[in-house]
Amino acid sequence: MTPPCLNCSIFPGALSPNASRSPLVCNISEFKWPYQPEDLNLTDEALRLKYLGPQQMKQFVPICVTYLLIFVVGTLGNGLTCTVILRNKTMRTPTNFYLFSLAVSDMLVLLVGLPLELYEMQQNYPFQLGASACYFRILLLETVCLASVLNVTALSVERYVAVVRPLQAKSVMTRAHVRRMVGAIWVLATLFSLPNTSLHGLSQLTVPCRGPVPDSAICSLVGPMDFYKLVVLTTALLFFCLPMVTISVLYLLIGLRLRRERMLLQVEVKGRKTAATQETSHRRIQLQDRGRRQVTKMLFALVVVFGICWAPFHADRIMWSLVYGHSTEGLHLAYQCVHIASGIFFYLGSAANPVLYSLMSTRFRETFLQALGLGTQCCHRRQPYHGSHNHIRLTTGSTLCDVGHRNSRDEPLAVNEDPGCQQETDPS
């Protein structure tokens, strides 16, 4: 039997940082992939460069500028969303509770995740914040990422119920129910983030027959790769593929429902006798068509943005788990491109959510301006119209808005001047 490495523990402290180490006292069989016997002749700096890469990412400057722009836009957008909902009681509707939870998760992604990633790009190693910070970082980022996806999915379900099943929405979509749902979202997100968190920790470059390389600690995967593959594949299935299919189907059903209501309204108008009644109805159809087109475009944008922003994130993790240990120069270059794109789109999603869900709403924007003293009351309401409106059309129109008003039991449904400003039923 070949003798083991002789007193390897003396090597790290016995030599200067730039000195080489002799392989004469070491058993060559001790070396396993990716380490090689010639590593004993390399300096610590050369070892770090070989196995950990440059200390600063080559594309750091352009990525830093891009991230800072996303950071400014995202923090302002999510901050405005939280401010409007917290400072205005009329905005504390069931729908807006989901928007508030989504804004909080996106804010945490931008305020915690983005600066830490920039820090690691600027200094890939060593990770100087300690093991506790490593665990906390993974747990927090994984939790807020999963919570963001669950919030988007829950909001899609809420909109489907409000539009397609309006009678059920009055009894189900209450403030108490939504609070329980939001709490369940964060609990589930935390629980599902634990497996990935448990697989990470501080990892230090350790060369056989030589020991740990100084200043090489990184916050990375330390658990079994097979288990990590299972975790990332399961996460991609449950928190990307399934939500993507869900919101796509729900928004398709919403669009079909709006189209069906338009056809029913046209049939109703044709059956009316007087020219004045038909003219009034045609104007109402035009207003509702404009509102429906706006809603349809927004729903399509939501699905596209969700797919574009989250697909690279999961592709990045799956690709890394598959190419680890089998990386060629071409695969490494491809992975670097995917990794950069995934980071940009990941944080871009957190910045785009408040624009898509909140700031695109006329009433939401004007309510914020009103809170700052820069705007007037939005959505001036006419007197309730007591004509022969279709019940489904009235209820659907009343649930497409993303802001609220006084309890709907105290105020009859009204026809609004602005089709993008329909009221929202707010049973509590």
Swiss-Prot record:
Pfam families according to UniProt: 7tm_1
Tissue expression remark: Ubiquitously expressed.
Keyword Transmembrane: yes
Main location, first listed in the record: membrane
Record topological domains on the Extracellular side: 1-59, 118-137, 203-235, 316-339
Protein's membrane topology: Multi-pass membrane protein
Transmembrane stretches, start-end: 60-80, 97-117, 138-158, 182-202, 236-256, 295-315, 340-360
Keyword Transmembrane: yes
One Gene Ontology term, aspect cellular component: plasma membrane
Disulfide bonds: C134-C219
GO biological process: calcium-mediated signaling; chloride transport; neuropeptide signaling pathway; phospholipase C-activating G protein-coupled receptor signaling pathway; positive regulation of calcium-mediated signaling; smooth muscle contraction
Entry's localization field: Cell membrane
GO molecular function terms listed in the Swiss-Prot or TrEMBL record: neuromedin U binding; neuromedin U receptor activity; neuropeptide receptor activity
Record keywords: Cell membrane, Disulfide bond, G-protein coupled receptor, Glycoprotein, Membrane, Receptor, Transducer, Transmembrane, Transmembrane helix
InterPro entries per UniProt: GPCR_Rhodpsn (IPR000276), GPCR_Rhodpsn_7TM (IPR017452), NeuromedU_rcpt (IPR005390), NeuromedU_rcpt_1 (IPR005391)
Cytoplasmic-facing ranges: 81-96, 159-181, 257-294, 361-428
Glycosylation sites: N27, N41
Family: Belongs to the G-protein coupled receptor 1 family.
PANTHER family per UniProt: G-PROTEIN COUPLED RECEPTOR, NEUROMEDIN-U RECEPTOR 1
Function: Receptor for the neuromedin-U and neuromedin-S neuropeptides.
Name of the protein this chain belongs to: Neuromedin-U receptor 1
